[in-house]
UniProtKB/Swiss-Prot annotation:
PANTHER family membership: TRANSLATION INITIATION FACTOR 5A FAMILY MEMBER (PTHR11673)
Taxonomy, superkingdom: Archaea
Modified residues (Hypusine): K36
Subcellular location, principal: cytoplasm
Sample GO molecular function, one term: ribosome binding
Gene field: eif5a
Keywords per UniProt: Cytoplasm, Hypusine, Initiation factor, Protein biosynthesis
Species of origin: Sulfolobus acidocaldarius (strain ATCC 33909 / DSM 639 / JCM 8929 / NBRC 15157 / NCIMB 11770)
Protein name, per record: Translation initiation factor 5A
One Pfam assignment: IF5A-like_N
């Protein structure tokens, strides 16, 4: 569970943030100054890394939010088991099963022996691309 903290005002499009316990990639940020004595508010729209679900966060720009630390690794596909793939990390030689991605551009390149890039975020792993 590796996270950092930053303020909502420091978030940029393309950065990552935790919303409702789910790591998300920020796709839109709008900031608005409210009232005479109110503080500026930000509306952050983000898409979940694992679910693909759209999530939003409305908060003051000086509020602290969690930012997940994304660890990028390279692995090799050992076996295709239908819905799952057996992957070997090329640094630690650890083997593990990952769910097969749903993106067509990744699925079309999946074959045993192919090198992949996968991300490890908050104890979960996801295949990002096939090299």
């Amino acid at each position: 569970m590796s996270i950092q903290y930053t303020t909502v005002g420091d978030l940029k499009v393309g950065s990552y943030v935790m919303i409702d316990g789910e790591p998300c990639r920020v796709v839109e940020i709008t900031k608005a100054k409210t009232g005479k004595h109110g503080s500026a508010k930000a509306n952050v729209v983000a898409i979940g890394l694992f679910t693909g679900q759209k999530r939003s966060l409305m908060a003051p720009v000086d509020q602290q939010v969690e930012v997940p630390i994304i660890e990028k690794h390279v692995g090799q596909i050992l076996a295709d088991k239908g819905d799952n793939l057996t992957i070997m990390d090329l640094e630690s030689y650890e083997t593990f099963d990952l769910e097969k991605p749903t993106e067509n551009e990744i699925v079309s390149k999946i074959r045993p022996g192919a090198e992949i890039e996968y991300w490890s975020v908050m104890g979960r792993r996801k295949i990002v691309r096939v090299k």
